[in-house]
Amino acid sequence: MTVNNEISKAFSKHADDYERVAKVQKEIGSRLFERLQYLKIAPRRILDLGCGPGFFSKELALLYPKAQIVGMDLSFAMLEQARKKQGWRRKWPLVSADMQKMPFATGAFDLVFANQVIHWSSSLGMVFRELNRVMNVNGCLMFTTLGPDTFKELQTAWSAANQYAHVNEFVDMHDIGDCLIAEHFMDPVIDMELLSIHYETLPQLLLALKTQGVRNINPKRNHGLTGKSAWKQFEAQYATMRTTTGKYPLTYEVVYGQAWKGAQRKMEQGIETWIPVSRVVKKS
């Protein structure tokens, strides 16, 4: 089974209840959506990348009533949930595809909204390169992803039990900015915040992650079963991190990103450069 199939299967399994249980992802997306409303843009075509059950596709359609929305997700089951949210007067295409190889024409979108999806890619550079391709000149990319401190409690607790990786690897915000520039995006703005979610019990915490589609795809993960001894060590170590009220904390390092697609200009030597659209001056 490929990594994409693993991810799709994990999300599809919980598609019916995803919007109800994925409160963290919805809150993060709402904060990104709030930032979007401050931008003075009028996109004609919008891609909701990793649209899931379609909550933000619907919000985007309300914010930009004249725009054509396209929802894309790896999971067919998620897209079926998104389809149910569409009114009979206004429907939008729903596409199942890999974000590293999207079935869209070059320059198709003026805005890409990507909430909690790009960290599921095996190559951030390939995702940004493909996004740059499908975006129109002066198009805007708005996204959220996760940083290295995400699930740090899980990392610490499992490190006391065995040498395997139990948490996915997340890219540092500074490296994300560098990657955007390397893939010809202009004026990237990256910032982060830490969110701490508290659970009454450890099983409750782990179940919440499972029902949110969270899956360990780290190449260094244990491909076999975890023994009872390692599990008990994990539980004991996590218990030492409980709050003063006895709850189990779980940290999310949330990274917010915004960038623009600049204009491409060919030099006499055949070398291509990318410049902000604001610097493009038409000759009279």
From Swiss-Prot:
Any one GO BP annotation for this protein: biotin biosynthetic process
Cited Pfam families: Methyltransf_11
Family annotation (InterPro entries): BioC (IPR011814), Malonyl-ACP_OMT (IPR050602), Methyltransf_11 (IPR013216), SAM-dependent_MTases_sf (IPR029063)
Gene3D superfamilies documented for this protein: Vaccinia Virus protein VP39
Documented EC number(s): 2.1.1.197
SUPFAM superfamilies: S-adenosyl-L-methionine-dependent methyltransferases
UniProt GO molecular function: carboxyl-O-methyltransferase activity; malonyl-CoA methyltransferase activity; S-adenosylmethionine-dependent methyltransferase activity
Annotated pathway: Cofactor biosynthesis; biotin biosynthesis
Key words, A-Z: Biotin biosynthesis, Methyltransferase, S-adenosyl-L-methionine, Transferase
Catalytic activity: malonyl-[ACP] + S-adenosyl-L-methionine = malonyl-[ACP] methyl ester + S-adenosyl-L-homocysteine
Family per record: Belongs to the methyltransferase superfamily.
Function recorded in the entry: Converts the free carboxyl group of a malonyl-thioester to its methyl ester by transfer of a methyl group from S-adenosyl-L-methionine (SAM). It allows to synthesize pimeloyl-ACP via the fatty acid synthetic pathway.
The protein, known as: Malonyl-[acyl-carrier protein] O-methyltransferase
Organism: Legionella pneumophila subsp. pneumophila (strain Philadelphia 1 / ATCC 33152 / DSM 7513)
Gene it is expressed from: bioC
